Structures are given as structure tokens and as C-alpha cells.
A protein has these predicted regions:
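N-terminal presequence-like segments and the immediate start of the first folded domain
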Residues: 4-82, 86-99, 104-152
Length: 152
């Protein structure tokens, strides 16, 4: 019985210390939240930098004038990847700094079309990547991309 109380107390102490460390790391730790110029006031950042790790999420390939995806899937993939590139440049990184990419697509038949464009964006090898079948995406998009880069 005494052994389980000691274990419980030690476990609780470890949990409190871990929680306190998390708060200390999260409060004023130098997170940078970056947005492309002219971005609408939306409830998210285009890029978040934490130390040497760069996070980009929810990137769509929308036409700047219409706010909609172009008719051609490859053109949409190009717009989305160009947008990822611009966002990485905000943080001083390049496409070759990417270590992880996640692509959501409601039509898995577009896998080869996406890859034909995607492969042209890298010189130093490819990041780890998943291509995930999804439900409908915002604005009728065919692709939504999340990415993590290291370095820059």
C-alpha cells in the first residue's frame, strides 16, 4: 500500500513538473507567427516558427483574382506549392528544407497529376509525405497541403 502511494505521489510530481515545463516553454518562448503580405484577417497564421521548426498548414491552390481553384488540377497543385514556397521563404527556408508534407485530396484519381507537379519543386530529395483521401475541401479545392520544415 505504501509503495503504491509513493508511486502515485511521484507520478503526480512528474506530471506537475512536466505541465509546468510545458507552460514555461509555451509562454514567451519566441514563437514567430508570420503571414503573407495582404493576407485577410483570418483566425490562423500562414506560418508558425518554433526554434528551427517551421509549420505551414491549410494551403490551398486558389487563383488570386477569383479566390477559386483553377479548372486544371495541375495548375491548382502549382498554385498551392508556389504558396508553400512563399510561406517558407517568409521563414528563411526553401522547399528543400521540408521534412514532412501531408496532402488532402477528395479525388484519389488525381494522385499522378499532383505528383507530376510536386516532383518539380525539389532538388535535394523529397520529404516524407502522405496523400490522404478526404471529403470536400474549402472553396471546391482539390488539394490542401500541410508541411513541416526544419532549418532555413
Amino acid at each position: 500500500m505504501r509503495s503504491s502511494r509513493i508511486t502515485l505521489v511521484l507520478g503526480g510530481a512528474v506530471a506537475v513538473l512536466a505541465f509546468a515545463a510545458g507552460i514555461a516553454l509555451g509562454a514567451g518562448n519566441g514563437l514567430k507567427r508570420l503571414n503573407l503580405p495582404g493576407a485577410a484577417n483570418r483566425p490562423f497564421s500562414h506560418v508558425v516558427v518554433d526554434g528551427g521548426t517551421i509549420y505551414v498548414a491549410g494551403t490551398l491552390g486558389l487563383d488570386a483574382e477569383t479566390g477559386k481553384p483553377p479548372a486544371d488540377a495541375k495548375a491548382e497543385a502549382r498554385l498551392a506549392l508556389d504558396d508553400i514556397r512563399r510561406k517558407l521563404e517568409l521563414a528563411g527556408a526553401t522547399m528543400d528544407d521540408l521534412v514532412w508534407v501531408q496532402v488532402f485530396c477528395p479525388d484519389l484519381e488525381l494522385y499522378d497529376e499532383f505528383n507530376a507537379v510536386y516532383r518539380t519543386y525539389f532538388e535535394a530529395g523529397f520529404p516524407a509525405r502522405s496523400f490522404v483521401g478526404s471529403g470536400p475541401l474549402l472553396f471546391g479545392s482539390r488539394f490542401e497541403i500541410n508541411a513541416i520544415a526544419v532549418g532555413g
